Amino acid sequence: MQITPFGITKNGETVRADTLRCGKNSATLLDRGATLHALCIAGTDVVLGFDSIGAYERNDAYLGAVIGRYANRIAGGFTLGGIYYPLAANDTDHGVHLHGGVVGFDRKIFCAEPYAALDGAGEGIRFTLFSEDGDQGYPGNLSLCVSYFLDAQGLMIRYEARCDKDTPLNLTNHSYFCLDGKNITTHTLQLFAGTYAKTDARLIVTDPCVSVAGTPLDFRSETSLAEALAAQSPVFEFAGGIDHNFNLDKTAPGQPCGNATLFPAAVLRAGQRSMTVLTNFPCMQVYTANFLHGKDPMKNGSLPSRHAAICFETQEAGADAPSRGEAILRADTLYCRTAKFLFAGFDA
């Protein structure tokens, strides 16, 4: 594993970059936000990112970062154990709490240490973080471990956590994927999900289980993203594209992964290239970078732009789930979830 300095934050924190390698694949992670900065498959970088820590700080797109304590949105706050916990409305466009707050996990410096597979096939890194009681308004002292492991097939992310009080927990990684270096209008998508969560103008869930049938969100068979995004449909009224939480079917054959079974969630294709998402998370927020913009150029020299990439945010539930009594980690209970991103066709 190669370790290099990446920069210094405006608060004076030193940020480092760790690069994992396995054959023709490499992954570069930043300790700020446990961020997936680059993922090169046979020489092709398939995730968006910036070249400087200043650019990451200036932009609020959460590129490649681990999100917590609560990925997605919460309307105002939540009640837990008879106590109401107000949360800051850091998404000012929609007036809601977004992705864990003003200083979510994406803006924190994690501790990093390498780890290796028992068979030696690949390289890994483990990021740990302590989130104190009251951090961004959430109850309980939370210990978090996020592990990345790179092998010849792709990248695995494992999330483990424990808290001394009941607390909402909805962890994810917010990487933006593009398989051909262009934009996602050249891609097709298949989702293993027959229902999604309907939202209001604030992107807060109003119905957590609506059929995708007859809507542009029906990706149960391989579908052109360009055609889906061009559809004139009420489902795109508030988000300007796909920014919806899908309930994963888990009906296709699963893949053993340690003590867990991972099920297909998505297949993204661009020509001969493909990425398959496997997970044991029950839900996944799919986001087509509808609000992506900015003046800082990305690694490839282009400016952040709408539909430049797509996010597969595997998670526990959709927006405002704590208000429905969902996505709650009970005190002294071990939380463990995994997501895998497998690649094919990059040598063709």
What does each of the following model-derived ranges do?
Residues 1-348:
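An exposed, glycine/acidic-rich loop-and-rim segment of catalytic or binding clefts
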